Amino acid sequence: MSTIIDKAKEIVEVNGMSDKITLLQGKMEEVVLPFDKVDIIISEWMGYFLLYESMLDTVLYARDKYLVKDGLIFPDKATIFMAGIEDGEYKEEKIGFWDNVWGFDYSPLKATAITEPLVDTVDIKAVVTDPSPVITLDLYTCTVADLAFRLPYELKARRSDFIHAVIAWFDIEFAACHKPIRFSTGPHTKYTHWKQTVFYLKDVLTVEEGETISGILENKPNEKNHRDLDISISYKLEANDMHRQASGESQYKMC
């Protein structure tokens, strides 16, 4: 069976580009390039929640070692967004399912199930709050250390509804194109492979239009497997009605 690089070589050859395109196989950190510097770096490094699988580390390594001064990176910016959603039916299916599994009580597994983010497509009608940008990474200047962060967010309710989860997605930018291009993986746009990442909350929040949920989003690579992510989301709803006020913090592992 041929590997993808074998097919790539065939494609280069049949298109008469062998004198212009050189293909190398190997890890970026290990491969030896036939030249000292490059003018452009192009990489599709994005994972679920933007940073899952830590592929951006390799792009930053290539940038620091090979990119010429004033060289170009595509894409060159990435922003993570958050929003609150109503998703009671699916939350009950995913979490409440463990209360009765063919007549048996599996409820001890609920605590584990809620720590696992769900990668799925979210209907725009389920989105209750305005989107909130949390972090923007500039690939010309960011470092590996910047990929672990603890940052505030604030979500403003568009309508009165319940909030069962928060979701995250990302936008990327190609600012150096002749006409700048922006590409989104949010619920407001067409389906993409990355979908959205759903984080179910322990509480069900009851919000009125105009109220805000504030909190902290923390992300860092898992210590045992740096391609996995340890994510923490705190939340606080200060409602006009004290009976609706709620706060908490949930831990998630993306693996």
Q: Model regions: which residues?
A:
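Class I SAM-binding transferase module
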Residues: 1-218, 222-255
